[in-house]
Amino acid sequence: MAYDQLKLQNQLCFRLYTASRLITQTYFPMLEKLGLTYPQYLVLMALWEEDGQKVMELAHRLYLDSNTMTPLVKRMASEGLVTRVKGKLDARETYVYLTDKAKELERQAASIPACMLGKVLSDR
C-alpha cells in the first residue's frame, strides 16, 4: 500500500467503530435477559429521563434518523413497551409514553451501568 495513513488499522474512525461495537456486544447478554435490544434500551433510557417525548425529539436525542426511529417505536409499541399518541394540536406529531411494563424494566435495568463498568474494566 502506497499510503500508510490509509490502512484500516490506522484510522481513528475504525478504532472508534470497533470500540462501539464491542461495548454494544457487551450489553447484549444483560439486555437479552430483559427482552430488549440495544436500540430499545436507548429509547427507554431517554423516556425514563423524560416520558412523553415526540418521536422526532427522541430521534434527534439518540442520533437516529426518522427511517430508523419510526419502526423502532412501532415495534416497541407492539411489544407493550410504549404507547404512541398523536399530537392534539398537530396530528403529524407522535408522542411516545412508557407503559407500566417499561416502567418495571427501569427497576430491573438499574444495575446495568455498574455491571457494564465492571465488565469493561475487568476485560483487560
Segments (PLM) and residue ranges:
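Charged, amphipathic alpha-helical coiled-coil/dimerization segments
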Residues: 24, 74-124
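Key DNA-contact positions within bacterial/archaeal DNA-binding proteins
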Residues: 39-41, 67
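The alpha-helix within a helix-turn-helix
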Residues: 59
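Residues within helix-turn-helix
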Residues: 55-56, 67, 74, 94
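Pre-recognition alpha-helix immediately N-terminal to the DNA-recognition helix
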Residues: 22, 26, 42-45, 104
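N-terminal leader segment of winged-helix/HTH proteins
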Residues: 1-34
